[in-house]
């Protein structure tokens, strides 16, 4: 094959297929066919929805025409309305006909396009089959030619060997005839091998040179075997008309609300440069790292011939969607019992008696300030999971969460105190959650105990106990003496048996966060009650806006466990942040899924906060600023040991205040007080309230240097009372008036350098020089001010008693007449407090 085969002279031409010659080392070259990519024609699918013709509003009742309209005018208007309706219906029919014609035209074009594509595919298939048949015939012909050449060479060598044998000396024939024949056979085999070697073109394709080729002047390397194969492949593809090219794979591309250009190219399996080029054709100058909207990305995907699958950002949570468990997979689980009731009614003491442990001794002031989660095994071998909720008014959200994750509510009511506000709240939480209730009447060992009054008071809140012919079980107990505890456990076991509680332990775990805190040594720690499945060490999970991998599981006894099944409360270590109490924990298959879900939830929460804090109009912003001018604020920072306590404190702070003063929580968090907190408090002039936490050494030093006040509390209502007292100091004092006397004007005198002086008789109380006065004429106040002088017998006096005469002159006022009455009063400031 010559070097000039298939080449033409250079010339100017458009973008058409051509050849490019590439040069390689050792003198090798390669021709590359450059083809122009044909643009894919996207034909819209038939069956597009037709726009509905808008209907005109119905005509009004002719009988109900406005006053002053004549019959002729009314008739003219009706005719005009009918004509308008007729025109509108004609236009609608015309539009429908045009739309129908356009749809038929689109259908015809689509059918033509499909027929054209079908014919093209059939032609390509025929060309492919024809090329394959020709290739097969060519190979057979080449093999047959090789076999014929070998046979011809063998036939030509046989006569030559015979003639050589005949020319040999006759004397040598009888002695070495056999050896001569063997030599001839070896020569024949050597000749055949040489012939076959020549058939391989002397190693041309392998690129090797022999000594004979060098001496004959046949220098230079020839085309390699790989180059020959590539040439044959190109020829075969050319014969098949390019149909052997790999067919394009149509992909379903998932398209979110916004996507990065490089990610879009990756999902389509296309080159990023091609995607950027298409965007530039659409007038968008973007780079591969920029984000484009979903509509633009959809046009790009359709341009490349792929299918669009629209997805939402919230679809990332589909991987943790709840799965219905099969009935055969469900197994019995322990009941979850929440103990609720008013503060100091003995809830923790009752649980203490059941657990036979002194839980209440560790609570500050004997008041539960966290949700305690415990597991108790009864004498009968049954396992019960208890949640002990706080009873203080500030812990409303904690009690609500306790009712939402429980199976049975034990309502503790003190026999000597009856139904109290938090008792009513606990009843409402239990009803809202739809869980059964058991009433435990505690403190029956006290002399003033009255269980009957408790049962009667419960009737006011639609709680009818069995003793009153109702359905709610009630048990009289004493946490102090242990009386009635067995009956209470029997009632709980009976109620749990009625509920038939089951769960599937062989599925990914799902649970609720009862409490969360930031531990100094262990990091973020969450107390989780497992509701479904089994949580194991090493599981990857997402909880609220946080995610993590289970590093350790610790049960209620402080022991490390490897797994936790349904209805088991455990502490989970391994979070990347502190979750909110009440968040749901879900186990995911990969860390990427968990991180994506957590980031999506965090973004949603951020958007909600931004939307809530944004003022919609300038007028609203100005009105809010004007309203805030008259309101005094007490800024504080709150740091607590657990998330639930911080939440309860913030809610309690929101309830403190009135129209004149309010408490503003600048920041609330979990964990020790840090230098960052001190810096924020100094900038805002706010004190730091620490609840069961302390400031570290650097924070204490910084606070002392900057004069920031840090207060520590262990009982929540002590904190609330102190903040309430501090907020009360911002209230303006209340001015009260005390009436101290009355005086009647008998005569009016004019005194030089003084003006008019009233001669008065004090009829009631006392008249003081420093007091305020009002002038009454016919029981109407005509002046209010102060006294310029108060004299008795030409002497200036401080006060005049009842029944005595005196002279009075008003400050900057002279319109006094005989018969007027002077009212004397004093003002005092009274300090106000917040209730």
Swiss-Prot record:
GO molecular function terms noted in the UniProt entry: GTP binding; GTPase activity; translation initiation factor activity
- The record places domain tr-type G at 332-500
Compositional bias per record (Basic and acidic residues), positions renumbered to this chain: 85-147, 157-166, 175-205
Which InterPro entries does the entry link to?
EF-G-like_DII, IF2_assoc_dom_bac, IF2_II, IF2_N, P-loop_NTPase, Small_GTP-bd, T_Tr_GTP-bd_dom, TF_IF2_bacterial-like
Q: Does the keyword Nucleotidyltransferase apply?
A: no
Give the UniProt family note: Belongs to the TRAFAC class translation factor GTPase superfamily. Classic translation factor GTPase family. IF-2 subfamily.
**Source species:** Ruegeria pomeroyi (strain ATCC 700808 / DSM 15171 / DSS-3)
Role noted for this protein: One of the essential components for the initiation of protein synthesis. Protects formylmethionyl-tRNA from spontaneous hydrolysis and promotes its binding to the 30S ribosomal subunits. Also involved in the hydrolysis of GTP during the formation of the 70S ribosomal complex.
Region ranges (G5): 478-480
Amino-acid positions noted as binding GTP in the UniProt annotation, renumbered to this chain = 341-348, 388-392, 442-445
Task: Tell me the PANTHER family matching this sequence.
Answer: TR-TYPE G DOMAIN-CONTAINING PROTEIN, TRANSLATION INITIATION FACTOR IF-2-RELATED
* Residue numbers spanned by region G1: 341-348
Pfam families per record: EF-G_D2 (PF22042), GTP_EFTU (PF00009), IF-2 (PF11987), IF2_assoc (PF08364), IF2_N (PF04760)
Q: Note down the stretches annotated as region G4.
A: 442-445
Keyword Nucleotide-binding present in the record's keywords: the answer is yes
GO CC annotation terms, alphabetical: cytosol
Q: Which UniProt keywords apply?
A: Cytoplasm, GTP-binding, Initiation factor, Nucleotide-binding, Protein biosynthesis
Comp. bias (Low complexity): 43-67
* Annotated protein name in UniProt: Translation initiation factor IF-2
Region (G2): which ranges? 366-370
Q: Where in the cell is it found?
A: Cytoplasm
Q: Where is this region: Disordered?
A: 1-243
What ranges does the record give for the region G3, renumbered to this chain?
388-391
């Amino acid at each position: 094959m010559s070097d000039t085969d298939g080449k033409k002279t250079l010339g100017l031409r458009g973008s058409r297929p051509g050849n490019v010659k590439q040069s390689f080392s050792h003198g090798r070259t390669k021709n590359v066919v450059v083809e122009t990519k044909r643009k894919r024609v996207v034909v819209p699918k038939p069956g597009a929805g037709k726009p509905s013709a808008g209907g005109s509003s119905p005509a009004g009742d002719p009988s109900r025409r406005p006053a002053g309209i004549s019959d002729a005018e009314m008739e003219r208007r009706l005719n005009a309305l009918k004509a308008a309706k007729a025109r509108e219906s004609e236009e609608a029919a015309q539009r429908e006909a045009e739309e129908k014609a356009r749809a038929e035209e689109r259908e015809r074009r689509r059918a033509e396009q499909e027929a054209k594509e079908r014919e093209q595919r059939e032609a390509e298939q025929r060309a492919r089959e024809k090329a394959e048949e020709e290739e097969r015939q060519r190979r057979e012909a080449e093999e047959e030619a090789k076999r014929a050449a070998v046979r011809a060479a063998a036939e030509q060598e046989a006569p030559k060997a015979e003639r050589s044998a005949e020319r040999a000396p006759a004397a040598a024939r009888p002695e070495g005839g056999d050896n001569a024949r063997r030599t001839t056979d070896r020569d024949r085999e050597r000749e055949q091998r040489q012939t076959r070697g020549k058939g391989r073109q002397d190693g041309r394709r392998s690129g090797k040179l022999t000594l004979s080729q060098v001496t004959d002047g046949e220098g230079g390397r020839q085309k390699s075997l790989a180059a020959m194969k590539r040439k044959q492949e190109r020829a075969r593809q050319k014969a098949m008309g390019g149909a052997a090219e790999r067919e394009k794979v149509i992909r379903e591309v998932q398209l979110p609300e916004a996507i990065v250009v490089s990610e879009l190219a990756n999902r389509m399996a296309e080159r990023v440069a091609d995607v950027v080029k298409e965007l530039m054709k659409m007038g968008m100058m973007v780079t591969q790292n920029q984000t484009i909207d979903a509509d633009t990305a959809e046009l790009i995907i359709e341009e490349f011939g792929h299918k669009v699958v629209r997805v939402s950002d919230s679809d990332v949570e589909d991987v943790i969607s709840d799965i219905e468990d099969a009935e055969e997979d469900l197994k019995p689980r322990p009941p979850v019992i929440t103990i609720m009731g008013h503060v100091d009614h003995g809830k923790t003491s009752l649980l203490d008696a059941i657990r036979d442990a002194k839980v209440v001794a560790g609570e500050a002031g004997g008041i539960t300030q966290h949700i305690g989660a415990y597991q108790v095994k009864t004498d009968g071998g049954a396992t019960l999971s208890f949640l002990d909720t706080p009873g203080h008014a500030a812990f409303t959200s904690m009690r609500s969460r306790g009712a939402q994750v429980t199976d049975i509510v034990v309502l503790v009511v003190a026999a000597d105190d009856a139904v109290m506000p938090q008792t009513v709240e606990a009843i409402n939480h239990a009803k809202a959650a739809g869980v059964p209730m058991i009433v435990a009447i505690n403190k029956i060992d006290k002399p003033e105990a009255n269980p009957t009054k408790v049962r009667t008071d419960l009737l006011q809140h639609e709680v009818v106990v069995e003793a009153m012919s109702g359905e709610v079980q009630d048990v009289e107990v004493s946490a102090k003496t242990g009386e009635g505890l067995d009956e209470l456990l029997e009632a709980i076991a009976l109620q749990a048996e009625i509920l038939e509680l089951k769960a599937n332990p062989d599925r990914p775990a799902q649970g609720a966060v009862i409490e969360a805190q930031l531990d100094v040594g262990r990091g973020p720690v969450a107390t989780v009650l497992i509701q479904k499945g089994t949580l194991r060490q090493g599981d990857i999970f997402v909880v609220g806006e946080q995610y993590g991998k289970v590093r350790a599981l610790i049960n209620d006894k402080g022991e490390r466990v490897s797994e936790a099944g349904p209805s088991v409360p455990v502490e989970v270590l391994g979070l990347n942040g502190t979750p909110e109490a009440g968040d749901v924990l879900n186990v995911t298959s990969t860390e990427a899924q968990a991180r994506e879900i957590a980031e999506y939830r965090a973004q949603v929460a951020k958007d909600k906060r931004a939307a809530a804090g944004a003022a919609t109009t300038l007028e609203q912003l100005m009105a809010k600023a004007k309203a805030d001018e008259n309101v005094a604020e007490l800024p504080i920072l709150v740091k607590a040991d657990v998330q639930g306590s911080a939440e309860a404190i913030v809610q309690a702070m929101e309830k403190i205040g009135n129209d004149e003063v309010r408490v503003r929580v600048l920041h609330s968090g979990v964990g020790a007080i840090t230098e960052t907190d001190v810096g924020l408090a100094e900038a805002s002039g706010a004190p730091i309230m620490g609840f069961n936490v302390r400031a570290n050494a650097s924070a204490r030093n910084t606070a002392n240097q900057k004069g920031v006040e840090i207060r520590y509390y262990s009982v929540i209502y002590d904190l609330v009372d102190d903040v309430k007292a501090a907020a009360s100091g911002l209230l303006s004092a209340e001015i009260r008036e005390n009436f101290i006397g009355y005086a009647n004007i008998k005569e009016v005198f004019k005194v030089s350098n003084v003006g008019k002086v009233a001669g008065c008789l004090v009829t009631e109380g006392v008249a003081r020089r420093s007091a305020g006065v009002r002038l009454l004429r016919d029981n109407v106040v005509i002046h209010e001010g102060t006294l310029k002088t108060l004299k008795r017998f030409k002497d200036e006096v401080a006060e005049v008693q009842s029944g005595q005469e005196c002279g009075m002159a008003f400050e900057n006022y002279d319109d006094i007449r005989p018969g007027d009455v002077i009212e004397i009063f004093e003002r005092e400031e009274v300090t106000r407090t917040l209730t």
